[in-house]
Structures are given as structure tokens and as C-alpha cells.
A protein has these predicted regions:
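Aromatic-rich carbohydrate-binding modules that target alpha-glucans
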Residues: 76-133, 146-160, 193-249, 257-280
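Bacterial N-terminal signal peptides
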Residues: 10-18
Length: 793
């Protein structure tokens, strides 16, 4: 960065604040209601309605006094109970208590009707215990009633300026070569020191004026002692911290400033664990995150904190060489930890530990892969996970790093691959790269941000759109993919919204058109996946035109293929739009599409049965049989398949169902009821058994379910009345499925190809005497599956 005398003079003399505003990504002065100027301590008669304080501007090393006078209509006007303050400094740092705690230290003195007084003594700093805080810019305070947890009455937030306090003046930047080659956290061999390296160069070839480390190793105090050095060749800020205890976890942040952009504190984008002051406490209460582990440094900083440990305990993998069996024909179980299990009576409390206990259930079902919805650190605790902010850290909402590894290890023991849903199209404003160059006025990434677009060039983005043409983004994504494959032993990925991996502008009508640049980007990522683990799979949520999807499939990738409408229609007993033949296309390799009847994003077939179509008033028995017939014309089709969790039990809560138990008008990400009690219902258990039987047949006879074995099917709308039909034939084995989706029995003629004994799944035998058109009776809402060999169920 080119520095002139003006910049250097400013850097040496400016007084920099330390507090971060929660609504912005950059640090700034917080303002509140205007407070009257006072040159003396006011009498009760001089107090105005609202907030009053003396002195008008506090000093950190002096006493401060605050009065609140309630106006008619205020929550506390006429209130006779005790009044307490909720108080902090800067952006609610050093808040001494949780909301609603009634202790004498926070109790305001009632000095007259509707007037309360609170004193910070002996000094502002000493009252807060903030003697070492680098700078106090303001005191934030509100007054509340003593029943705030049950019947809240409170004032608005007030902010009182603090002047003449400690300041920080950065030293001139030292230019020095960085001893490490990659950005991130680099422990020494003995673990007693660690080098931090942070990339910083914007699209205008400028960088921040200075960077400092703050953390547990320096009690979060901003000082020139921990000011980072600059390597202009690597574009790194870097610093080596010594005196580290290898067995201890440390929290830290980068604190950076510039005359142009102000100040910002960020975590390390490559850290493997973070602390969140707004959300972690709930995980501790729930027992998901250990109370004995490192906790957020409340009162000492704001924003997400990165964690490092130079010599962490290593996980002892029981299975180190797992490989997916037949990835081109795998059956995947899409799973959201949050809604798969439940702790107590509360929704959204699913954990890794509880999910691990149900692996026998998944194994018995017959799937050979689990696809986890996003688990990389996301904003908040309750989410689908498509709001990522730290890609190398697994979210603590579901458990610890070790528990994630244990889950994957246990899956591998059961012969189940684990795929991870990754979200590289976008990130939230909490991501360090977003915060580093941020437009506070518009709440967007700034124009000079080298990782993000200001606005997405495509119409489907949310949050902040990554620029995948940027070498920095490509390097980051590929490094993350390699890390996930090696550190956690994931067996592959499902990439979210890959249609957005382009810089070519488009609208809803053109975004699906073939985009050669997008193909190049995805092939580049696939090369990293394939080089790291040749057996790993890469699935795309792409939904583009066939010419592009076909090219990606021929390169080795797989693509989501949505069959929800067709199977919802057949599940409801409606023939219109129920054509299954779209599952296959001569222009697409059979292993290229991962077909699904349901996904996290689509409506549940069993719910639509209850709300629309010809089965609204049908018994549960009939509805589950219809869903079993759906499964028979889904799981027998060659090529990869995916099941959404609990679809095998006929889960019939709508995607529009809301957390409060009401029905919304559009799909939402609210937690849904966890219905393990479905297993005790004979009809739902019967559907599970149908899935399990079909999958066992598929797993035991891989040659019969290969693409080469596919011979014929009649699954269009015109085949509805006389029954749908599918035929597979390998070298020695044959299979025929006939299905009736109507509410009445049908008599039909079936092509078997040869006469003789054919075997049903239930063990019964059919003697076929007419190989071209054998008469078969199919009960309503049912299917029959025949093989030319006995099936062992």
C-alpha cells in the first residue's frame, strides 16, 4: 500500500476506538437519545423526563451518576416495584450479569415518584472491573422492572459518552518476511509458539493501516507489543506469539484499522473452532457444549472469536481406509441433525450423539450413504446451515469436533459413507473475508473486497456472493475441500447452488443456459476432490440445461435431479404430471443424476396426500401402501437415489409447518416435529419395511440394478389405468415390477420375457405361462415385484 506523510501522521496520532456495533461489521460510535448538558449535579426539580447524567460526559477514572425520570406512558411510569439497570460499556461489553438478574449491585435507588438514580463508583472503570480495557467510549444502560423475565417493563437503550479515556496509537508498521507460506494458524513443532498469518490486499492493491492480535494470551488488550508485521510479497499480516501452553485452548481475534474504513475485529478464516458470545451459552445449558471447555471472553471483546490449540488431542480413527461401495448406484439418506433427534420436549435440539444411536436404524433401512445438511459454522444455533460464516469450524450446535469424527467413524464401521452439504455460493456478513472489506452504509461487501461480489450476477443468491473467478476464492474453497476430506474423512460433497458459480450476468430465464466458465470452475473443484480422494463423490445442486449437466456428469460429477412433483402426484393418486420417465435421459449418463422424491427443499409427499388429490380421506393404511408403490418405482430404477429423512415412515408434516405449531403459507426452515413414535405404527413400519426390502434386493444384486440391466418401463401418464411397469435383466437375473396407483383393483397383462416360475417378494410363486402378456391382478394402491430367482428377505 502506498503511504504518504498524511497517512503516516494520521496513523501515529489518531485515537482509535475498540467497540464493535452489533448491527454493523465495522466499529463506530454508538449514539442514543440526546442527553441534556449539565454543569452541575442536578436537583430532583431540574431533572428532565428520560435520562439525565452527571457529569454530562463521563470520564473512565471518575464517578458517574445517572437518573431516569419516567414520563406518562412509559413502561415504568407509576411502577411501585424495585427497578434495576442492565448496563455495559461500548457495544454492551463488560455487561456484569445476564438479563433479568436482580442483585443489589444493579438496583437503582428510587429518589422520588417515577425517578430512579444509579451511581457508578468509585470510578466508571472500577465499577465494571474494566481497568485493563483499552478504551471506554460510552456507557450503555437501560432501566427495567424486577420481573423482566416474566412481565417485562423497561426503557429504551441510552448511551452516555465517555471522554479522556485510554487511547491506542499504532506504531509504524514493520516490514518483514513471513516465515509461513499459507494464511492461517501455524503452531511450532513443540507447540510453545504459534505464528498467525492473515491475507489482506483489496482489489485496489491497498491494505489496512495496521493489524494487531488480541486474545487470551494478552488479556485482550490492544497494544503495540502485539502489532503484526507486514509481508508485502505474500500480502500477509503476521506475528508469532510465544509462551504458549500446548495443552490449552486460546481465544483470539485480529484487530485492524485504517483511516478510510475505520476499525474491525475478525476471527481467523482458517480456524477450526469459534466462540460466539450470543449463542454459546445456550449450548452449555443444553449440555451440547461442555461447560469445562473454553468459553467466550464476555466483556473483553465482541464478535466471533477464533480458537486455537497448538497440541490438541488426536482422534484415533477406527476405520482409516473406507471406500464407497458402488458410488454410481448409491442410495443416500439426507439428514438434518437438528430435526433427526430431540432432547427433552424442545424442538431443534438434535445432536450428533443422539443421531449416532440411530445408525442401526439407518443401516437396517439399507442406504449406503448419509448426506449431512450443512454443519460448518453458521450464524446462530437453529438453522438449516445454509448461512455459513466459518468453513473450517464445525458448528457446536450439534456437538464437539470429536463427536463429529466419531459419527463419521461409526458410519464407516457400518459401511455407510458420509457426504457433506457444502455452501460455497455465499457466506454471511460474519465471515472474516466479508467483514474485512465491508460497506456499512449499505450492509454489503465493499467494491474493493477481493473475495465477494457487491451484488450477485445471478438471480438466486442470498447473503453475500462469492466471486469464483477470483484466484483467492478458488484457493480458499480447494483448501477447505482438502481439509474436510483429510481431517474429517468425509467421502464426498453435495455442493449447494452451483448455478451461482459464475460471474456472467443472468436472470431467471437465462441462468440455466450453458455457461462454459461455470463448467471450468466446477471441474477445477472436482479435480481437487478427486486428487485428494479418488473415491470421493461430488454432487451438485445445479438445475441447469441438459447440455451443461451432461458435460459435468461425463467429467465425473453427479447432479441433483428433482422428481418431487411426479411422485407427489402419484402419491396423491393423481395421474396428471406423474410421469416417472424424466428420471432417465439418453443424453445423460445413468450415474449422473441423483434422483429424489423428496429433499429438505421440497414438500413432503405424505403431507400432500392429506391435503390434496384422491387420497385426502383415505386411511393411513392405504396412504402408506401408495407410498410403498412410489418406492417400488423409485428404488428399483438404476442410478443414484436420495431419500429425505423419515420419508421411509411417511412423514406428513408440511415444509410450511411452523415452530409454533401453526401452518404457514410458504416453505420455511423452522424446526419440525421429530416422530420416532411413527415406528410403533404398523402401517408406517410397514412402509419402512417396504423400503428396507427393496434396498436389500438392490444391495444384494448390484448387477441387476446396473444401467446395463435396464430394459424397459411404462411409467407415463398414459400407463396409469392399466398399471405401471418396469423390467430389469442382467446376465442371469430378471426383475419385473407392476404397480397400481389407483383406488381400485386392476387386471393387466404383463410382459415377463420367459415362462416358468417367478417369485414375489412375499415368497409366493407365480407360474408364468404367457411370457408376452401374463394376466396379473394388482390390488388398489399396491405393487407386485417378481424375480426369476428366490429372494431372501
Amino acid at each position: 500500500m502506498k503511504k504518504d506523510i498524511k497517512h503516516i501522521f494520521w496513523m501515529l496520532l489518531c485515537l482509535l476506538t475498540i467497540v464493535a456495533c452489533s448491527d454493523e461489521n465495522h466499529e463506530m460510535l454508538i449514539t442514543g437519545p440526546e442527553i441534556p448538558e449539565l454543569d452541575h449535579e442536578p436537583s430532583i426539580e431540574e431533572l428532565v423526563e428520560g435520562i439525565n447524567n452527571y457529569p454530562t460526559k463521563f470520564k473512565g477514572d471518575k464517578q458517574g451518576k445517572i437518573w431516569y425520570k419516567a414520563a406518562a406512558g412509559d413502561d415504568l411510569y407509576g411502577y411501585e416495584g424495585d427497578v434495576y439497570v442492565h448496563i455495559g460499556i461500548n457495544d454492551w461489553m463488560y455487561v456484569p450479569t445476564e438479563w433479568g438478574v436482580n442483585e443489589d449491585k444493579y438496583k437503582a435507588e428510587k429518589v422520588a415518584d417515577n425517578i430512579w438514580c444509579f451511581t457508578l463508583a468509585p470510578t466508571v472503570r472500577e465499577w465494571f472491573g474494566a481497568e485493563n480495557a483499552a478504551n471506554i467510549q460510552n456507557v450503555c444502560i437501560l432501566f427495567r422492572n424486577d420481573e423482566a423475565l416474566t412481565d417485562e417493563k423497561k426503557t429504551s437503550d441510552f448511551f452516555i459518552t465517555v471522554t479522556g479515556d485510554k487511547t491506542f496509537t499504532p506504531a509504524p508498521v514493520e516490514i518483514a518476511a513471513c516465515p509461513v507460506e499459507e494464511a492461517g494458524i501455524h503452531p511450532s513443532a513443540d507447540g510453545t509458539s504459534v505464528t498467525f498469518a492473515l491475507y489482506d490486499l483489496d482489489t485496489d492493491n491497498n491494505y489496512k493501516d495496521y493489524a494487531c492480535l488480541i486474545g487470551d494470551f494478552n488479556d485482550w488488550e490492544l497494544s503495540t507489543e502485539y502489532q503484526m508485521k507486514r509481508d508485502n510479497d505474500k500480502h500477509f499480516w503476521w506475528y508469532t506469539v510465544t509462551g504458549i501452553d500446548p495443552a490449552k485452548e486460546y481465544g483470539f481475534q485480529y484487530y485492524m484499522g485504517s483511516e478510510k474504513d475505520g476499525n474491525v475485529r475478525i476471527g481467523d478464516p482458517y480456524c477450526e473452532k469459534v466462540l460466539d458470545g450470543s449463542n454459546d451459552k445456550y449450548l452449555v445449558e443444553q449440555g451440547v457444549y461442555p461447560a469445562s471447555a473454553i468459553q467466550y471472553p464476555n466483556g473483553k471483546t465482541t464478535g466471533i472469536v477464533s480458537v486455537f490449540q497448538t497440541k490438541p488431542a488426536s482422534y484415533n480413527w477406527q476405520v482409516s481406509d473406507f471406500k464407497i461401495d458402488n458410488p454410481d448406484n448409491m442410495v443416500i439418506y439426507e439428514l438434518l441433525f437438528r430435526d433427526f433427534t430431540q432432547t427433552g420436549s424442545e424442538l431443534a435440539t438434535g445432536t450428533i450423539k443422539e443421531a449416532t444411536k440411530h445408525l442401526d436404524y439407518i443401516k437396517s433401512l439399507g442406504v449406503n450413504a448419509i448426506e449431512l445438511m450443512p454443519i460448518q459454522e453458521f450464524d446462530g444455533n437453529n438453522s438449516w446451515g445454509y448461512n455459513p460464516c466459518y468453513y473450517f469450524a464445525m458448528d457446536k450446535a450439534y456437538g464437539t469436533k470429536e463427536e463429529y469424527k466419531q459419527f463419521i467413524d461409526e458410519c464407516h464401521k457400518q459401511g455407510i459413507a458420509v457426504l457433506l452439504d457444502v455452501v460455497y455460493n455465499h457466506a454471511t456478513g460474519s465471515h472474516p473475508f466479508a467483514k474485512l472489506y465491508w460497506n456499512s452504509k449499505e450492509s454489503k461487501t465493499a467494491k474493493n473486497n477481493p473475495w465477494f461480489n457487491v451484488d450477485a450476477p445471478h438471480p438466486f443468491s442470498v447473503f453475500h456472493d462469492f466471486n469464483h473467478e477470483s484466484p483467492l476464492v478458488r484457493e480458499f474453497v480447494k483448501r477447505n475441500l482438502k481439509f474436510l476430506l483429510e481431517e474429517y474423512k468425509f467421502d464426498g460433497f453435495r455442493f449447494d447452488l452451483t448455478k451461482g458459480f459464475t460471474q456472467n450476468k443472468s436472470n431467471e430465464s437465462t441462468a440455466s443456459n450453458k455457461d462454459d466458465s461455470r463448467i471450468v470452475i466446477l471441474k477445477d473443484y472436482y479435480k481437487t476432490v478427486n486428487t485428494t480422494n479418488p473415491n470421493a463423490v461430488m454432487i451438485l445442486e445445479h438445475f441447469c440445461n441438459l447440455d451443461e449437466e451432461s458435460e459435468l456428469a461425463k467429467a465425473g460429477m453427479k447432479l441433483w435431479h428433482n422428481m418431487n412433483e411426479s411422485y407427489c402426484q402419484s402419491g396423491m393418486g393423481e395421474s396428471s404430471n406423474s410421469d416417472f420417465s424424466y428420471m432417465r435421459n439418453s443424453g445423460m449418463p445413468a450415474e449422473g443424476w441423483v434422483n429424489f422424491m423428496e429433499s429438505h427443499d421440497e414438500e413432503r409427499v405424505a403431507y400432500k396426500q392429506t391435503a390434496f388429490g384422491n387420497l385426502q380421506n383415505a386411511s393411513l393404511d392405504i396412504r402408506m401402501k401408495q407410498l410403498g408403490t412410489n418406492a417400488a418405482f423409485f428404488l428399483t430404477v438404476p442410478g443414484p437415489k436420495m431419500i429425505w429423512q423419515f420419508g421411509e415412515l411417511g412423514y406428513d408434516y408440511s415444509i410450511m409447518y411452523k415452530y409454533d405449531g401453526t401452518m404457514g403459507t410458504e416453505k420455511n426452515t423452522d424446526a419440525k416435529p421429530v416422530k420416532w413414535d411413527y415406528l410403533t405404527d404398523q402401517y408406517r413400519k410397514g412402509l419402512y419395511d417396504t423400503y428396507s426390502t427393496l434396498l436389500k434386493l438392490r444391495n444384494d444384486n448390484p448387477d441387476l440394478f446396473s444401467d446395463n440391466a435396464f430394459k424397459d418401463w411404462k411409467v407415463s401418464v398414459s400407463d396409469w389405468d392399466k398399471g405401471r411397469y418396469l423390467r430389469l435383466e442382467s446376465t442371469t437375473k430378471k426383475l419385473v415390477v407392476v404397480g397400481n396407483f389407483k383406488n381400485e383393483q386392476i387386471n393387466t397383462g404383463v410382459y415377463f420375457g420367459n415362462t416358468g416360475d417367478w417369485y414375489e417378494l412375499n415368497g409366493e410363486t407365480l407360474n408364468v405361462t404367457n411370457s408376452s402378456e401374463q394376466p396379473v391382478v394388482i390390488p388398489a394402491n399396491s405393487f407386485k415385484l417378481y424375480t426369476n430367482f428366490p429372494v431372501n428377505n
